[in-house]
Amino acid sequence: MKYVDTNIILRVILRDNEELSPLAREILKTNECYVLPEVIPEAVYVLNKVYGFNRQDIAHAILQLLPLVVVKDVRLTRLALNYFSELNFDYVDCILLARNKLYGHQVATLDKKLEKAIATLPPVSLY
């Protein structure tokens, strides 16, 4: 078992380094690799702010990567990425929204737009 950092995720998605990108992909293919919940928001941020990826491309790239790694709550991650690609919220707000819709967790916020999304988006079935 290996925990992978954001650099591994980025090298696999970006394929921007002749030496490191294939190495990163090989690490994912030949090991049971875990991604901590904190790594995905960092990858989302870097892909958007540093590399200029749009929301849909970010969500698609990370969703394509998920079968290669173990994520603690993959269902939550998938839903948050889907919200991120479809709604105009920061990724962390999408995680909060996904927690509310999947598990009924209450969210305290001063963000009226997020509050409205919590009130109007339907819950997601766990089954």
Q: Which stretches of residues belong to each language-model region?
A:
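Acidic, PIN/NYN-like endoribonuclease modules and their adjacent C-terminal/linker elements
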Residues: 1, 97, 101-127
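Short, well-structured N-terminal submotif of metal-dependent ribonuclease cores
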Residues: 1-35, 50-57, 127
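Alpha-helix capping/helix-boundary segments
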Residues: 8-9, 39, 76, 95-96, ...
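Residues that scaffold the ATP/ADP-binding catalytic core of kinase and kinase-like folds
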Residues: 11-13, 46, 117-118
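Alpha-helix C-terminal capping segments
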Residues: 24-31, 62-66, 100-101, 118
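Active-site-proximal, substrate-binding regions of enzyme catalytic domains
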Residues: 46-68, 75
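Active-site neighborhoods of divalent-metal-dependent phosphate/nucleic-acid chemistry enzymes
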Residues: 70-110
